[in-house]
Protein backbone atom coordinates (compact mmCIF):
# COMPACT_ATOMS: atom_id res chain seq x y z
CA UNK A 1 0.00 0.00 0.00
CA UNK A 2 0.91 3.68 0.03
CA UNK A 3 3.10 4.76 2.91
CA UNK A 4 1.90 7.62 5.16
CA UNK A 5 4.58 10.19 4.36
CA UNK A 6 5.36 13.04 2.00
CA UNK A 7 8.60 14.29 0.50
CA UNK A 8 9.65 17.31 2.59
CA UNK A 9 11.41 20.63 1.84
CA UNK A 10 11.27 20.35 -1.93
CA UNK A 11 12.56 23.90 -2.61
CA UNK A 12 16.09 22.75 -1.83
CA UNK A 13 15.91 20.51 -4.92
CA UNK A 14 16.39 23.53 -7.13
CA UNK A 15 19.93 23.99 -5.87
CA UNK A 16 21.25 20.55 -6.79
CA UNK A 17 22.60 19.49 -10.15
CA UNK A 18 21.22 15.96 -10.06
CA UNK A 19 17.64 16.64 -9.06
CA UNK A 20 16.59 13.02 -9.42
CA UNK A 21 19.24 11.90 -6.96
CA UNK A 22 18.20 14.41 -4.34
CA UNK A 23 14.51 13.64 -4.65
CA UNK A 24 15.16 9.94 -4.33
CA UNK A 25 17.50 10.63 -1.42
CA UNK A 26 14.91 12.59 0.55
CA UNK A 27 12.33 9.90 -0.20
CA UNK A 28 14.58 7.10 0.99
CA UNK A 29 15.64 8.96 4.14
CA UNK A 30 12.03 9.80 5.00
CA UNK A 31 11.02 6.16 4.59
CA UNK A 32 13.95 4.95 6.64
CA UNK A 33 13.14 7.36 9.47
CA UNK A 34 9.62 5.94 9.85
CA UNK A 35 10.73 2.86 11.73
CA UNK A 36 7.61 2.84 13.91
CA UNK A 37 5.52 2.43 10.76
CA UNK A 38 7.59 -0.52 9.65
CA UNK A 39 7.48 -2.36 12.97
CA UNK A 40 11.27 -2.56 13.07
CA UNK A 41 13.01 -3.88 16.13
CA UNK A 42 14.75 -1.04 17.96
CA UNK A 43 18.42 -0.94 17.09
CA UNK A 44 18.04 -3.12 13.98
CA UNK A 45 20.28 -1.99 11.13
CA UNK A 46 18.11 -1.34 8.10
CA UNK A 47 19.05 -3.05 4.85
CA UNK A 48 18.70 -0.96 1.68
CA UNK A 49 19.33 -2.32 -1.82
CA UNK A 50 20.03 0.19 -4.59
CA UNK A 51 19.64 -0.97 -8.19
CA UNK A 52 21.66 1.14 -10.61
CA UNK A 53 25.12 2.60 -10.04
CA UNK A 54 24.65 5.78 -12.05
CA UNK A 55 24.76 9.34 -10.73
CA UNK A 56 21.57 8.81 -8.73
CA UNK A 57 22.44 5.39 -7.37
CA UNK A 58 25.97 6.34 -6.36
CA UNK A 59 24.81 9.49 -4.56
CA UNK A 60 22.20 7.48 -2.68
CA UNK A 61 24.70 4.79 -1.73
CA UNK A 62 27.23 7.38 -0.53
CA UNK A 63 24.71 9.28 1.59
CA UNK A 64 22.94 6.27 3.09
CA UNK A 65 26.18 4.45 3.87
CA UNK A 66 27.39 7.43 5.91
CA UNK A 67 24.18 7.16 7.92
CA UNK A 68 25.13 3.62 8.89
CA UNK A 69 22.51 1.74 6.87
CA UNK A 70 23.40 -1.68 5.46
CA UNK A 71 23.64 -0.75 1.77
CA UNK A 72 23.98 -3.10 -1.20
CA UNK A 73 24.53 -1.66 -4.69
CA UNK A 74 23.61 -3.64 -7.82
CA UNK A 75 24.83 -2.85 -11.34
CA UNK A 76 25.96 -4.73 -14.43
CA UNK A 77 29.04 -2.51 -14.82
CA UNK A 78 31.77 -4.13 -12.74
CA UNK A 79 34.13 -1.18 -13.24
CA UNK A 80 31.63 1.16 -11.59
CA UNK A 81 31.11 -1.29 -8.76
CA UNK A 82 34.86 -1.55 -8.11
CA UNK A 83 35.00 2.24 -7.80
CA UNK A 84 32.05 2.19 -5.38
CA UNK A 85 33.64 -0.58 -3.31
CA UNK A 86 36.93 1.33 -3.11
CA UNK A 87 35.29 4.57 -1.96
CA UNK A 88 32.22 3.53 0.03
CA UNK A 89 31.47 1.24 2.95
CA UNK A 90 28.94 -0.86 1.05
CA UNK A 91 28.51 -4.28 -0.53
CA UNK A 92 28.19 -4.65 -4.30
CA UNK A 93 26.62 -7.30 -6.53
CA UNK A 94 27.34 -7.43 -10.27
CA UNK A 95 24.40 -8.20 -12.52
CA UNK A 96 21.03 -7.06 -13.82
CA UNK A 97 18.80 -5.75 -11.05
CA UNK A 98 15.76 -7.25 -12.77
CA UNK A 99 17.28 -10.75 -12.50
CA UNK A 100 15.82 -12.68 -9.58
CA UNK A 101 19.06 -14.60 -9.04
CA UNK A 102 21.04 -11.35 -8.79
CA UNK A 103 18.54 -9.96 -6.28
CA UNK A 104 18.83 -13.14 -4.24
CA UNK A 105 22.63 -12.70 -4.15
CA UNK A 106 21.98 -9.26 -2.65
CA UNK A 107 19.77 -10.90 0.02
CA UNK A 108 16.65 -9.13 -1.20
CA UNK A 109 14.46 -11.25 1.09
CA UNK A 110 15.77 -9.30 4.09
CA UNK A 111 15.71 -5.84 2.49
CA UNK A 112 13.71 -3.14 4.24
CA UNK A 113 13.83 -1.00 1.11
CA UNK A 114 14.76 -1.51 -2.56
CA UNK A 115 15.37 1.55 -4.73
CA UNK A 116 15.51 1.07 -8.51
CA UNK A 117 17.12 4.10 -10.13
CA UNK A 118 18.66 2.91 -13.39
CA UNK A 119 18.30 4.99 -16.56
CA UNK A 120 15.61 2.60 -17.86
CA UNK A 121 12.08 2.96 -16.50
CA UNK A 122 11.07 -0.54 -17.55
CA UNK A 123 13.99 -2.06 -15.68
CA UNK A 124 13.16 -0.02 -12.58
CA UNK A 125 9.52 -1.11 -12.49
CA UNK A 126 10.34 -4.75 -13.19
CA UNK A 127 13.11 -4.74 -10.58
CA UNK A 128 10.70 -3.43 -7.95
CA UNK A 129 8.07 -6.00 -8.87
CA UNK A 130 10.53 -8.88 -8.55
CA UNK A 131 12.06 -7.40 -5.38
CA UNK A 132 8.66 -7.35 -3.68
CA UNK A 133 7.89 -10.86 -4.84
CA UNK A 134 11.17 -12.01 -3.29
CA UNK A 135 10.51 -10.35 0.06
CA UNK A 136 11.60 -6.69 0.01
CA UNK A 137 9.38 -4.74 2.41
CA UNK A 138 9.17 -1.50 0.40
CA UNK A 139 10.20 -0.38 -3.08
CA UNK A 140 10.81 2.92 -4.87
CA UNK A 141 11.06 3.14 -8.66
CA UNK A 142 12.48 6.06 -10.58
CA UNK A 143 10.07 6.60 -13.50
CA UNK A 144 10.99 9.46 -15.83
CA UNK A 145 8.78 8.79 -18.86
CA UNK A 146 5.63 10.90 -18.34
CA UNK A 147 3.48 8.34 -20.19
CA UNK A 148 4.57 5.57 -17.82
CA UNK A 149 4.26 7.83 -14.81
CA UNK A 150 0.62 8.66 -15.60
CA UNK A 151 -0.20 4.94 -15.45
CA UNK A 152 1.48 4.36 -12.09
CA UNK A 153 -1.74 4.99 -10.18
CA UNK A 154 -3.35 2.11 -12.06
CA UNK A 155 -0.39 -0.24 -11.71
CA UNK A 156 1.05 0.61 -8.29
CA UNK A 157 -0.77 -2.18 -6.49
CA UNK A 158 0.02 -4.78 -9.16
CA UNK A 159 3.67 -3.68 -9.27
CA UNK A 160 3.82 -3.66 -5.44
CA UNK A 161 5.37 -0.17 -5.52
CA UNK A 162 5.57 1.87 -2.34
CA UNK A 163 6.41 4.95 -4.41
CA UNK A 164 7.25 6.04 -7.94
CA UNK A 165 9.41 9.14 -8.34
CA UNK A 166 9.41 11.39 -11.41
CA UNK A 167 12.14 13.97 -10.68
CA UNK A 168 11.38 16.34 -13.54
CA UNK A 169 7.64 16.43 -12.80
CA UNK A 170 8.13 17.10 -9.08
CA UNK A 171 10.57 19.92 -9.75
CA UNK A 172 8.25 21.44 -12.39
CA UNK A 173 5.35 21.38 -9.93
CA UNK A 174 7.50 22.99 -7.27
CA UNK A 175 8.61 25.79 -9.59
CA UNK A 176 4.97 26.41 -10.51
CA UNK A 177 4.00 26.67 -6.83
CA UNK A 178 6.85 29.07 -6.13
CA UNK A 179 5.69 31.31 -8.99
CA UNK A 180 2.13 31.33 -7.63
CA UNK A 181 3.31 32.16 -4.10
CA UNK A 182 6.55 34.13 -4.67
CA UNK A 183 6.63 35.60 -1.14
CA UNK A 184 6.34 32.26 0.63
CA UNK A 185 9.48 31.06 2.41
CA UNK A 186 8.10 27.52 2.59
CA UNK A 187 5.15 25.68 1.02
CA UNK A 188 3.74 22.37 2.26
CA UNK A 189 1.06 20.41 0.35
CA UNK A 190 -1.59 18.24 1.99
CA UNK A 191 -4.62 16.15 0.97
CA UNK A 192 -3.08 15.09 -2.36
CA UNK A 193 -2.43 18.65 -3.45
CA UNK A 194 -5.85 20.08 -2.55
CA UNK A 195 -4.55 22.07 0.44
CA UNK A 196 -1.37 24.12 0.80
CA UNK A 197 0.16 25.59 3.95
CA UNK A 198 2.35 28.66 3.42
CA UNK A 199 5.06 30.14 5.62
CA UNK A 200 5.32 33.88 4.97
CA UNK A 201 7.89 36.35 6.37
CA UNK A 202 6.34 39.17 8.42
CA UNK A 203 8.14 42.46 9.03
CA UNK A 204 8.25 44.16 12.43
CA UNK A 205 5.92 46.82 11.05
CA UNK A 206 3.34 44.22 10.04
Regions found by a protein language model. Name each.
Residues 2-4, 10, 14:
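Cationic, amphipathic, low-complexity segments that mediate targeting or membrane/lipid association
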Amino acid sequence: GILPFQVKKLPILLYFQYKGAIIALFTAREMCSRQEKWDNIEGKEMKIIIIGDGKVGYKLARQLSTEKYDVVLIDSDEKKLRFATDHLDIACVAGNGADAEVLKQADIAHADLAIACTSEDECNMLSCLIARKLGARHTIARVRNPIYYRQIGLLKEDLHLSMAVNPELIVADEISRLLIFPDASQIETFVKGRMELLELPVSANG
